[in-house]
Amino acid sequence: MSRNDKEPFFVKFLKSSDNSKCFFKALESIKEFQSEEYLQIITEEEALKIKENDRSLYICDPFSGVVFDHLKKLGCRIVGPQVVIFCMHHQRCVPRAEHPVYNMVMSDVTISCTSLEKEKREEVHKYVQMMGGRVYRDLNVSVTHLIAGEVGSKKYLVAANLKKPILLPSWIKTLWEKSQEKKITRYTDINMEDFKCPIFLGCIICVTGLCGLDRKEVQQLTVKHGGQYMGQLKMNECTHLIVQEPKGQKYECAKRWNVHCVTTQWFFDSIEKGFCQDESIYKTEPRPEAKTMPNSSTPTSQINTIDSRTLSDVSNISNINASCVSESICNSLNSKLEPTLENLENLDVSAFQAPEDLLDGCRIYLCGFSGRKLDKLRRLINSGGGVRFNQLNEDVTHVIVGDYDDELKQFWNKSAHRPHVVGAKWLLECFSKGYMLSEEPYIHANYQPVEIPVSHKPESKAALLKKKNSSFSKKDFAPSEKHEQADEDLLSQYENGSSTVVEAKTSEARPFNDSTHAEPLNDSTHISLQEENQSSVSHCVPDVSTITEEGLFSQKSFLVLGFSNENESNIANIIKENAGKIMSLLSRTVADYAVVPLLGCEVEATVGEVVTNTWLVTCIDYQTLFDPKSNPLFTPVPVMTGMTPLEDCVISFSQCAGAEKESLTFLANLLGASVQEYFVRKSNAKKGMFASTHLILKERGGSKYEAAKKWNLPAVTIAWLLETARTGKRADESHFLIENSTKEERSLETEITNGINLNSDTAEHPGTRLQTHRKTVVTPLDMNRFQSKAFRAVVSQHARQVAASPAVGQPLQKEPSLHLDTPSKFLSKDKLFKPSFDVKDALAALETPGRPSQQKRKPSTPLSEVIVKNLQLALANSSRNAVALSASPQLKEAQSEKEEAPKPLHKVVVCVSKKLSKKQSELNGIAASLGADYRWSFDETVTHFIYQGRPNDTNREYKSVKERGVHIVSEHWLLDCAQECKHLPESLYPHTYNPKMSLDISAVQDGRLCNSRLLSAVSSTKDDEPDPLILEENDVDNMATNNKESAPSNGSGKNDSKGVLTQTLEMRENFQKQLQEIMSATSIVKPQGQRTSLSRSGCNSASSTPDSTRSARSGRSRVLEALRQSRQTVPDVNTEPSQNEQIIWDDPTAREERARLASNLQWPSCPTQYSELQVDIQNLEDSPFQKPLHDSEIAKQAVCDPGNIRVTEAPKHPISEELETPIKDSHLIPTPQAPSIAFPLANPPVAPHPREKIITIEETHEELKKQYIFQLSSLNPQERIDYCHLIEKLGGLVIEKQCFDPTCTHIVVGHPLRNEKYLASVAAGKWVLHRSYLEACRTAGHFVQEEDYEWGSSSILDVLTGINVQQRRLALAAMRWRKKIQQRQESGIVEGAFSGWKVILHVDQSREAGFKRLLQSGGAKVLPGHSVPLFKEATHLFSDLNKLKPDDSGVNIAEAAAQNVYCLRTEYIADYLMQESPPHVENYCLPEAISFIQNNKELGTGLSQKRKAPTEKNKIKRPRVH
């Protein structure tokens, strides 16, 4: 209670009729210590009149009722009478909890939970808090007890190793119940052992390779210790497989299903130690075979342990042989490096009395150990305070090598990072001595850290003390100096007088540990250096003594205010660790910063800046001193207290991380909002997710933002949350939408995340000067983001060096250093190498001499433009771009530097799955070259996850990514994007994509883009085109190409019109050549006047409406599509336009196919105004080289009439400018017509075919009025999202159910499967469609006719060659039953495949619902139960005896068969649907019913009277009887 508070503190006892004796006892005991003037006894009526929290202490008994709920809702401080008695008795303060406290049974207990469902966890938290305990969500040192639902989590393992009690949730429930009954006063009154978490709780254990006795023992012990034993290995059920030897079918399946494969040692160690052990220590993997191949292709001597280094080790080229010592030294060294580890397994770790911080600062990776050895070493590292890494990366400082080192060799070859590679003996010696030993005597011979040569290596302080005794003294290497000098002389021939020392790069790679770093600069190996250059190099290297003493907050003083004592001391320690100074309130010195909580507090002292703990943590995270004004969270946030305007809001954050995200989450919770990590459309109670209402982000982009747009949810800036906090009212979202925010606002918000140094004063903060120095050593290309091309970076770098003034916080350099591309750059694993071109002198020579004031201007003469253009051309020719640039760019006027056009995958962030780790570097490089960003591990910024796997993959990584809703694509998506140099649709590349089963994507993409974008192109080019009503073929081509090129460049295509024209002409020429090739391959005599190239003159007889233009383009694209589908040759993208002659490989097979295609193409001979060209694609089926097509290709094929080409007459009175088209009986929607200029036409004209049927506009409109209600099946998540959005956009509905819904009209199926949803759709006669139907609808812009896209139609089955026999049967069944049932419906009979059936089901309860839905969807009546009276009514009885549980009550099958009921196995239902003629019932009869069937046959009474209904209707219903 602060002194400034005017309001007195009252203790109020709530009197009611239900008060217990304990209530009055508490009142008496408090009177002894508290003055009665501050004690009040209030009635329930008075309590209900309280309208706000008056900061009094309320004593309630019981903890229920209207009054209790009222006070709790107001946030009043409520305790039970037992709390008062306990506190009086133990002289303790009443807890200041934000929640009611009933008693103090758990007053000294702090719990954390693991592996509990959300509801259970919240219940545990509630009871613990009501019993005076504390709850932490994270496991930390303060936690005293862990409540576990099952074993195996990280919390569980840590708590078990720390010997913290791990108990069941029932312990909390029992404590609460006993305390309610007043039977206990402390948690220790109950025996905790009764509630201890069993060792194998939640484990389902299976074994392989064990003998019978061992297997039985494992089974008994598993059940005894709370686990479950399973004889069969079942996917998604078994959690552990105990393996004798790593081989066998169970072992292989377990590995694929991500089941823990462990040794028996894991099982018995867990029982011995009393808790479930970490499975990773006991992994069973086949021992890798020792490789006998040499590490280098260069012949070496027999003893090559030290010489077997690869080129990636060499960063100082002049000292390659510096560490090649004599063989005698090698032998003596090797004898030291091979420690004897036989006794390591039996080592007693507890025997060491080493300090807890012995390995402080060591980041250690263990390589080549397994079993007990690995366990012992891990325990040693943990006890010594070291950080143990599970993955070898550049953060590791020490690698301890054991029996094999294959993984280390790969890392050593790929990475320039050189950790200390030592044997286990070094670790054991450190622990036995009790202090850190020098690594040098223990370094492994094959892994010498040679990026700093041995003779020049900066030594640690420990090494300096022992320098005299070290075998690596300088005189040992005197003979090698001559070789070094020779290398230096040789290298100097290529340096052209360069004064750059290679050690400049080395100084960046490894931090200096001592002031002796300057010594190598005066060494004899650098005699060729000039004197003044030595001084410039030494200027680059800062003094070590200054580095060690300075920190981020050097010379800065701080006041810490408004925090609890614990938090205040933690913050003070952090500031001191970063060289800051903590001031006391009594000090007269003005502090630079006052650190306060996010919501602020009263600061009476005079300070320079008032900042929040968010600012402090962010500065430390980025090691940069930020300007407090750069982010609103860096200064106290004004909040209207007591207001919760966001109570009904569920908020998700995007593009926020670290302290910033934590602060925003705290602020949102304070305002009453719920914050969740996932952005979801619908609530999911099982996963504890609520439907999101708001997305807060910094800039447009990312999967969450796209989802928000799709779902019409507000995506707002952080300012919306701050404004809501300031006013206490929910701010209007429309004023804070991310779309409306300016670029400056967004960039300001993203500065923290991108780590921009906003206020780094170098004079005051030499620590930041060190960072600046390090940046000057590397090349100025943006090596991390990979967003700019190398050649542009060179030119822009030169302009910045000459024209731009130094940025704030960066020191002026006396002389900029050159940036040599050393091997350590271009062999770096994590970076894409881009060569740096030194064109400074060349550009300087081109500058026009002028006055001194003009010298700093950027050269902008036409010659410099030529250089840039030719560099662009060189890069374009060396990479596989989709469209080659012109070989002769025209000289333009000097232009100011423009912003670079975004690359195809701009704003895409990819992450490659661990499953494809071998290809990760390669794929990351490709992504970077396309303008994408990449992440080594998955985080919330990732938009595309690259994965390859099965349709229902159980991989944990895949599952977790799938829940995030990002694009999951195949690696071939990225490869094809690079091939096409464009952003291809992700839906065409699911993670199951197999290129061997598909045709070229580029054909699909081009055709689809042309069709979908043409209309907008026509309508938007009125100013550009002289006459938009008369379009020639080439105009259409140009427009489509222009659209494709301008789409990614955001409208910058106008400036590149010449380049686009050149590209268009080139594309047209390539197409002409390919068309000529096709036509020349055939021996067909050409009609008179027919040409082999596209007509440039065109034809003016095209329709004068935009719609007809679109129709024209659509017809033409279908012809081109047919050509694309028939040829697989792709023109060389590197061919320049000037190269008229191409050297190609003559493929005779391809020539034959082109001839076959040409023979199938029947060109019309009359340029009729409304002629439509259609290609016969059915003959393509005969090709032995046919491959399955993609969905959009199938869609375009199916739109074409598979019949011969027809030429129809133009209608005299077109209605609404739509054409009446002759079609087949299948009622196709009229296909748009192509103009006559699509291909050259010959004379004389061909006579028109007779019309079969005309569809009028009225019929079409009637057809469109029908309902479109879809269900989706066997599609991946990306396709589901895409198609749901498409269907809703076209006016249809989507039912998102796992099971079949009879109200649906269409079901789109990825693959025909024998599952409930598919079979039920077949039985109900629904449209069962291929996904290409939706692609066709997307292209047409409305729902099209279904026949050609139906599973079972020839247009689908003929192009899908990869489906098996069962899938084909299922597909044909769908079409057959749909036609049957539709015919019956047309005749007025509404029924399904099973109409007339009255079924008794005798199946397992878990499967009964599925069978029931299936039968009912086909019109069957399912009778309740299987009692004898029902046999009179029933026609069929289906039973699945094999899968019934033993305790299921039986059914009298013999009695049913006697009453002429078909008693069949359940397989009959699916086969009845799939087979063309109904299957014979005898093949499916249950054993008990076979004799009755045979008797009926002999007597000739195949059917009972109940099956022989006299009506015609029953004859139709029962066509299957034999």
Swiss-Prot record:
GO BP: broken chromosome clustering; chromosome organization; DNA damage checkpoint signaling; DNA damage response; DNA metabolic process; DNA repair; DNA replication checkpoint signaling; DNA replication initiation
Comp. bias intervals (Polar residues): 1039-1058, 1083-1114
Question: Where is it made, tissue-wise?
Answer: Highly expressed in heart, brain, placenta, lung and kidney.
Pfam families membership: BRCT, BRCT_TopB1_SLF1, PTCB-BRCT, TopBP1_BRCT0
- Effect seen on changing residue 155 to E: Impaired interaction with phosphorylated MDC1. Does not affect interaction with phosphorylated TP53BP1
Annotated BRCT domain residues = 101-189, 195-284, 354-444, 548-633, 641-738, 900-991, 1259-1351, 1389-1486
Q: Which CDD domains match?
A: BRCT_TopBP1_rpt1, BRCT_TopBP1_rpt2_like, BRCT_TopBP1_rpt3, BRCT_TopBP1_rpt4, BRCT_TopBP1_rpt5, BRCT_TopBP1_rpt6, BRCT_TopBP1_rpt7, BRCT_TopBP1_rpt8
Spans of biased composition, class Acidic residues? Answer: 1024-1036
> What result is annotated for mutating residue 704 to A?
Decreased interaction with MDC1. Does not affect interaction with phosphorylated HTATSF1
In chain numbering, where does the motif Nuclear localization signal fall? 852-858, 1517-1520
**Which region ranges are annotated with the description Interaction with CIP2A?**
756-891
Modified positions (Phosphothreonine) in chain numbering: 298, 779, 848, 861, 1062, 1064
Subcellular location(s) per record:
Nucleus; Chromosome; Cytoplasm, Cytoskeleton, Microtubule organizing center, Centrosome; Cytoplasm, Cytoskeleton, Spindle pole
Question: Which GO MF term does the entry hold, naming one?
Answer: DNA binding
Extract the ranges annotated as region (Disordered).
1018-1058, 1083-1118, 1501-1522
Keywords on this record?
A: Chromosome, Cytoplasm, Cytoskeleton, DNA damage, DNA repair, DNA-binding, Nucleus, Phosphoprotein, Repeat, Ubl conjugation
Instruction: List, alphabetically, the SUPFAM superfamilies matched.
Output: BRCT domain, Uteroglobin-like
Induction note: Up-regulated during the S phase of the cell cycle. Up-regulated by E2F1 and interferon.
How does this protein assemble?
A: Interacts (via BRCT domains 1 and 2) with (phosphorylated) MDC1; promoting TOPBP1 recruitment to DNA damage sites during mitosis. Interacts (via BRCT domains 7 and 8) with (autophosphorylated) ATR; promoting activation of ATR. Interacts (via BRCT domains 7 and 8) with (phosphorylated) POLQ; specifically binds POLQ phosphorylated by PLK1, promoting POLQ recruitment to DNA damage sites. Interacts (via BRCT domains 1 and 2) with (phosphorylated) RAD9A. Interacts (via BRCT domain 2) with (phosphorylated) TP53BP1. Interacts (via BRCT domain 2) with (phosphorylated) HTATSF1.
- Name of the protein described by the UniProt record: DNA topoisomerase 2-binding protein 1
Q: Which organism is it from?
A: Homo sapiens
The gene it comes from is TOPBP1
